[in-house]
């Protein structure tokens, strides 16, 4: 009897081992299938996001075509809604004096002041203060908003007075929204981001702002109001006369550039003194069949507040990069269990992943992707990840970041090509910056001086393309070989 029991126990143990081995093999095969599916999703996403040089040229050329069509007539239908900015002349670098600036952003505004020393002299006495806008003012009238800003400006000026001030000091003003103008000294906000009050759209902002300043006894007057990208171009031109464009790559995106006045039929006022003007391209709205749009981009666009609009912006701006990554990771989690058998709840929350967190994962070059693991835990509550899973997340971030960077480069290349400056002319492109001070200074200089006009920038319509490799937007040697430069005033 004992012998039979031993035999049965042995057979049972053997069967258990066999079953365990079978289950283990099945589990391994399942994991292998899931991993292959993960890789399949990753490879397809990489292919759909690919930006080979010929495609970048197609994007650049399409942008140039839309720019030309938009400038030809205000009634021409294009994906761009370019706006003439009546800033003329731009700073020359010779401006001197003490100036104030204000940058009206989405949820806050920045006040700053500084003394400009002219050529070869550093900026001095720089002071700045960032002030949050109370939530109740987001839906208030423009009068209430400007009253609040005027009071804060009054406090700032009392702390940092212009001791050599005239009766009224000049104030440069930048707003983070498109501004349609007939003169630089006034502007109409087309859409003011983050604000819901209808009264701020279509209002003459400068006159409202100056009225608030006067009512509160603040000895400042707004002499120029432009959008933030045009302001950045003004800042770049102060440092380098070869600055021909400025690009904003933040939560939103835009590009502004210097265009000969005779190329823009939308100019409704007197011709500028220096024969050129600043154009705000509003390139966030640019769209083309050549853009590498994936199923994730299509779904994001369909679920956005403005479906079918701002397609270029949704590929390159900080508002959307993290969300694109989240959507790819969600598909992997749902179909391949890359983060385990249960899909993390936070991974299903739209816009849970911010672009700064996505950028941190993109920049994680450690062997075990430690930062990626930390961000997955912090953002999505994923407490345990394998090295392979973290590597996949890193690759998704890389793909999205690279596509955005290369498309941005293609856009910049398109502007330089539109100006006919690719081959032989030095071109400086300013990225970000704080242009309000320089804007105020340039308008002051315009009143005091009549500078000698500069030659108009070249604007030949020769569409002959240089060698593709030499003009590669990601080629580090290109800027030096052809004299093109990208700089950031770094004043924020």
Question: Where does each model-flagged region fall?
Answer:
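Conserved beta-strand elements of beta-rich interaction domains across eukaryotes
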Residues: 105-109, 116-119, 136, 176-180, ...
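Condensing-enzyme catalytic core mediating Claisen C-C bond formation in acyl metabolism
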Residues: 292-295
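Asp/Glu-rich intrinsically disordered low-complexity tracts
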Residues: 449-492
